[in-house]
């Protein structure tokens, strides 16, 4: 016969020691006692082994902490008598894992040894006959829990409740000069208006609806001053630092370093959010990754492309002799000499690379202004000289127009000259602005030489080519 095991009383309980049933045969009782004692021995052995393992684990943790403490103490003893400045780096966070290990029971994973199959024993003795008298005697000895307390009656909702024990007469029970029992039904009796019945619910509603007296600020029309909210934010403050007048060098002081060198690389202060001076950042010279590609010919900037060709001339002018190639050469040479002279001039010191190496017409104009000395070094001229120069230029233009009128190339040359003068500010279409660096720059640019008269020896094939 197998022993009956007790039910688990706690959630997660692993072990359950069986108890021995009464009224068993002798052999059966002895077998169950032996099995229960053997089971109890296994359970106690497992419990003590787990406790010893947990104690060993805790002892190893305490030993590791002790080693850390001894190491820190040895470091402190080593630097205690030193007079050299030591910089200590401390982490802002405690060196511990971000998530702590949860506590686990020492009985996790334990198995109940009672679940194992045990050998079955065969008992030869027979059961004793049932005795009714003995059974009745056992029932008398066992305590039986019987509830003798009567169930509470529902409280009356209309009356005052149960009758008190100190009532001695009927007159003290009934309402004065009436036959109303207030403990059964609570009423307000008025001889003129009649009896008005009120229950406990109505009385509770009256008490709940009653308001308290108004505060003094409302009844006396007083005004409360608005309270200033307190600021609970942390505001760092260095405070008042006491001034100590001591000599600059204090030799042979115990526990004081003698090689302190205060510099700006000590790191942030104790109040990093306090306002402080911003250190000056170093300047970095940035360079362009890919320089601008400028079309150069023999180290000289190429002139801008020529204007579009004019419309075809009438047939009368088409039969004119062509322009010899020697006339175009001086023009190109003069432009190249002008560009080479401007490029060969010394560059301004400290100017950026894009300004020193211009890549367009505006850059060339700025470079010419810079070489001329700017507005501060420009020489101003009087209005009389400028008017005389303009009159001379107009006379020269009229002479050229009369001497070279009717020729295709001369007309084209005159148009180019007028265009250059209009751009430089000398033409009739330009505004009469004040003199300055622009006038000086425009004067420094030489005009194109006048075209030579065409020779009769050239053929028309050269003009067409």
UniProtKB/Swiss-Prot annotation:
Top-level taxon of the source organism: Eukaryota
Biased composition (Gly residues): 424-436
A family per Pfam: WASH_WAHD
Keywords tagged on the record: Actin-binding, Cytoplasm, Cytoplasmic vesicle, Cytoskeleton, Endosome, Isopeptide bond, Membrane, Protein transport, Transport, Ubl conjugation
Modification comment: Ubiquitinated at Lys-220 via 'Lys-63'-linked ubiquitin chains by the TRIM27:MAGEL2 E3 ubiquitin ligase complex, leading to promote endosomal F-actin assembly.
GO biological process annotation, one example: positive regulation of cell migration
Compositional bias segments (type: Basic and acidic residues): 382-398
Region feature WHD1, mapped onto this chain: 1-167
GO molecular function: actin binding; alpha-tubulin binding; gamma-tubulin binding; phosphatidylinositol 3-kinase inhibitor activity; ubiquitin protein ligase binding
UniProt region (VCA), positions on chain: 349-465
Region described as Required for WASH complex assembly: spans on this chain: 1-54
Domain WH2: 361-383
Family: Belongs to the WASH1 family.
Domain comment (free text): The VCA (verprolin, cofilin, acidic) domain promotes actin polymerization by the Arp2/3 complex in vitro.
Function per UniProt: Acts as a component of the WASH core complex that functions as a nucleation-promoting factor (NPF) at the surface of endosomes, where it recruits and activates the Arp2/3 complex to induce actin polymerization, playing a key role in the fission of tubules that serve as transport intermediates during endosome sorting. Involved in endocytic trafficking of EGF. Involved in transferrin receptor recycling. Regulates the trafficking of endosomal alpha5beta1 integrin to the plasma membrane and involved in invasive cell migration.
Complex formation: Component of the WASH core complex also described as WASH regulatory complex (SHRC) composed of WASH (WASHC1, WASH2P or WASH3P), WASHC2 (WASHC2A or WASHC2C), WASHC3, WASHC4 and WASHC5. The WASH core complex associates via WASHC2 with the F-actin-capping protein dimer (formed by CAPZA1, CAPZA2 or CAPZA3 and CAPZB) in a transient or substoichiometric manner which was initially described as WASH complex. Interacts (via WHD1 region) with WASHC2C; the interaction is direct. Interacts with VPS35; mediates the association with the retromer CSC complex. Interacts with FKBP15.
Protein name: WASH complex subunit 1
Organism from which the protein derives: Homo sapiens
Source taxonomy: Eukaryota, Metazoa, Chordata, Craniata, Vertebrata
Gene of this entry: WASHC1
